[in-house]
Amino acid sequence: MLQRIISIFVLGLYIVCSACDVYASEHHGRRTCKVFLMPLLLGYYVLNANMVSTFLCAALVFGWIGDLCLMKDGKWPFVFGLTAFMIGHFCYIYVFTRDLLIYSIRPIYYLSLIPYLIYLALSMKHIVPHAGRKMRYPVMVYMVVLLVMSWTALLRCLASGGLPVWIGSLLFLISDTLIACRTFLKGEYKGIMLTYVLAQFLIISGFIS
């Protein structure tokens, strides 16, 4: 009973901190709450999971590192943040593909890769060229890893269920696309943090029974 109460309290804190940070990000306010998001989500996951996955925990830790890096301006914080999030995506990919080994994948499921390839082609055409000579290839690699993460989440959903995880991966894709557009195409792009906090929550909640 006590664990349940603590879990609800932690989830409530995550929702409040998420709402505060979403508001701050949209109105150029101080991003104080951002540092608490992933630790709170990690705590919520550990309190509720029947079997705690080291790789899911690692994904949240690297997501937290990425959050901290992106709170700073400049090239190197962006590069370190990109690297941290990419490692987190590799952790998610491992968990998704590990689950896929239990189920048989029908050949028709591989057609689901087509929309992702279209997205990749559009990104290579409209976003990557604006990243600059030194950042072009790191951004390309990150986009490929991000798409693989979302695609493996989709395969897992088709094979065994897990719709929240796939929706979360799509929101992650949207959030990172908005960040790329804001960084390289310049301009105001709304919804980055809203899609991000929902993405992480849906992915993690998909592994809580």
Predicted regions and their residues:
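Polytopic alpha-helical membrane-helix bundles and their juxtamembrane interface segments
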Residues: 1-209
